A protein has these predicted regions:
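Acidic/histidine-rich catalytic neighborhood of metal-dependent amide-processing enzymes
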Residues: 134-208
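Acidic/His- and Gly-rich active-site-bordering loop/insert found
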Residues: 2-131, 148-157
């Protein structure tokens, strides 16, 4: 009996393309954007935790992560999510950072008929508060991981995830949390998919 053929890079790229073309990415991002995770608005405190508990946690659990929500070291600051998926302690480990909070929606500054918390696609561009900062980025990272797991059954590396909900107000408590969780956050490389694109049509990568 011949051995099953291992998926190729082309197979992975094709599977990732299908996630986009099937509308899965757009549907999931629409659900994330719909939550008004405005960290600048004290009235949205419960929504910030809801994003972690109801949106991020189930997605990560589905991929075999151990997931925990932690109180913020700073009083009244929103919680943080820490997750890990260890296939083998001997394998390299990546740490993915993301934030689920957004700036004020500024509803009255959007074009008539549009809302910052309801996505819309115009001329191939998807609009909605958080699509580019930062819900879209960490969602893409997670869907890429899920695509590989579904395709190969494993990743071939370990993954840790840190998601905060207060980046837009200066990340209160993040430094203290990271110091306290130093061992839990230990990794070989950090992937922080946040920041500007120098040119819209060309991916930007900062190394260091």
């Amino acid at each position: 009996m011949s051995k099953p053929v291992a998926p190729t890079r082309a197979d992975a790229m094709s599977a990732g393309k299908q996630v986009i073309e099937s509308g899965q990415l757009e549907r999931r991002l629409t659900d994330l954007v719909a939550l008004r995770t405005e960290s600048q608005d004290p009235a949205q405190t419960a929504v910030l935790e809801q994003y972690l508990r109801e949106m991020m946690r189930p997605m990560l659990l589905e991929m075999g992560f151990d997931v925990a929500l932690h109180d913020n070291p700073v009083l009244k600051a929103p919680p943080l999510l820490l997750a890990s998926r260890v296939e083998n302690p001997e394998l390299p480990t990546i740490l993915i950072y993301g934030h689920g909070d957004v700036i004020h929606g500024q509803d009255n500054q959007w074009n008539p008929g549009l809302s910052p918390f309801a996505t819309v696609t115009l001329d191939g561009m998807m609009y909605g508060r958080g699509t580019a900062d930062n819900k879209g980025q960490h969602l893409i990272n997670f869907l890429a991981l899920k695509t590989l797991i579904d395709l190969r059954g494993s990743l071939g590396f370990n993954v840790k995830v840190l998601i905060e909900m207060a980046e837009e107000i200066g990340s209160p408590g993040l430094a203290e949390f990271c110091a306290a969780q130093r061992e839990a956050l230990a990794a070989d490389v950090l992937i922080a998919s946040d920041g500007p694109r120098l040119m819209p049509e060309i991916p930007t990568m900062f190394m260091g």
